[in-house]
Every structure is written in C-alpha cells, then in structure tokens.
C-alpha cells in the first residue's frame, strides 16, 4: 500500500519516490516490486555528500569497516553513477550478539551526472572509512565564432 494514501509522505519519502519512480507496467498489481522496495531501503540507508569543485564533482559516502572489495563504483546508462555493495555481519561460533545496531546488508546510491561530467575520468579513493568518488568535468565548449558572409554587388 502506498504511504501517500494516508498522508504519511515526508520529504525523504517523496525524494525516494521521485528517484525510484517505477513505470506502471513494471509494478505487479499496482504495488511496489520487491526490487523497488529493496533498492529504496538501500538508498535511504546510504547518505552522501555531493560537492561541485572547480574542475570536478565529488561524491562522498561514509563506508566504515568496509574493504574496497565490498564496494562497487560503476557508471551505467552513460550518465548514472552507481555506488553499491554489501556490509556483511561478522559470524563467529564462539560469540553471540546481545545488541545489533549497525546496519548490515546491501547499500546503493545512484546519481544522474550532469552533461559536463567526463564519464571516462572517474576515480574512487577509500580512506579512513570514507569513499570519495571524483568525476572530472569536461572542458567548456569553445565559443562559436560568427560566420562572415560576403556581400556581392548586384
């Protein structure tokens, strides 16, 4: 059932609905698909900072306790930056959890890149549990010079 029907729409939920809007033909029986719900939860649990720098865009995501093998950075559909992965629970035979507050499971964020982003120049660095993905900007286009038309005498 859609939360909007009960007046429970918050700005965060509205943003998720906008970002993850599924075409009507992709919904089974008018409800959200399992993939849609899973992706919405993964995106809501992955906050990020996006900065515009002089020559690049920077996407900063906290990734405490994850190794680079647990994180994927991809560009899909030519203009969508996807940061995803999975945080797994540490399993030990000689220990049991008394409290589990850290989020486990899959995480994901998608960002539509601006037209001036150079998708061939993407770099990712993970330092001290913080992932920074840098996407360089394309150089600005050269201004078009006016074309001079020769005037003929008739």
Swiss-Prot record:
InterPro entries (alphabetical): A-crystallin/Hsp20_dom, HSP20-like_chaperone, Small_HSP
Protein name as it appears in the record: 17.0 kDa class II heat shock protein
Induction: By stress; by heat shock.
Keyword Protease in annotation: no
One Pfam family, short name: HSP20
Gene designation: HSP18
Domain sHSP, chain residue ranges per copy: 39-154
Protein's cellular compartments: Cytoplasm
Disulfide bonds: none
Protein's organism: Zea mays
Cytoplasm as UniProt keyword: yes
GO molecular function terms noted in the UniProt entry: unfolded protein binding
Keywords, sorted A to Z: Cytoplasm, Stress response
């Amino acid at each position: 059932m859609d939360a909007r029907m009960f007046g429970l729409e918050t700005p965060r939920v509205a943003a998720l609905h906008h970002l993850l809007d599924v075409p009507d033909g992709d919904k089974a029986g008018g409800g959200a698909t399992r993939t849609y719900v899973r992706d919405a939860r993964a995106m809501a649990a992955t906050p990020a900072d996006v900065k515009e720098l002089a020559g690049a865009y920077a996407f900063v995501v906290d990734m405490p306790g994850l190794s680079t093998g647990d994180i994927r950075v991809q560009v899909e559909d030519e203009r969508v930056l996807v940061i995803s992965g999975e945080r797994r629970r540490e399993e030990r035979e000689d220990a049991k959890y008394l409290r589990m507050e850290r989020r486990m499971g899959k995480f994901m964020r998608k960002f539509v890149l601006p037209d001036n982003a150079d998708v061939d120049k993407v770099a990712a660095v993970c330092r001290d549990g913080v992932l920074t993905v840098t996407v360089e900007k394309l150089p600005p286009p050269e201004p078009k010079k006016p074309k001079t038309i020769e005037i003929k005498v008739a």
